[in-house]
């Protein structure tokens, strides 16, 4: 399900954003409205995701979100890149019942915090782990083929 990438763009940030958007595209969110992806405390990542959403013609909106305003948000998905795993978990717990699909690039163990934890392997490719407990609590359905691609450990 991954799109071929131009070799000049084949870097880890590009791959993380494309992987995030690809997983999101294989997810069935609870509502039928346009999906809002909120990026916590990282306007640069917001800008990059907006660029790739436009380039790949996805119908998502993206906004930067300060973690202080997390509870009052209307986000169907959230992207953490600088937030520690424990704080990710606390923020997600504060919005319990909203069904938020969460992604992180700052959660190597993936035991608490985000549902999908993206990382760069020692060979330079992008992979991810899945926290199945968080996924089941979110009540968001993700195509099982995506879950089969997750890595248990490097």
Where are the regions a protein language model picked out?
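Short hydrophobic alpha-helices and adjacent helix-cap/hinge residues
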Residues: 8-154
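Bacterial N-terminal signal peptides
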Residues: 1-5
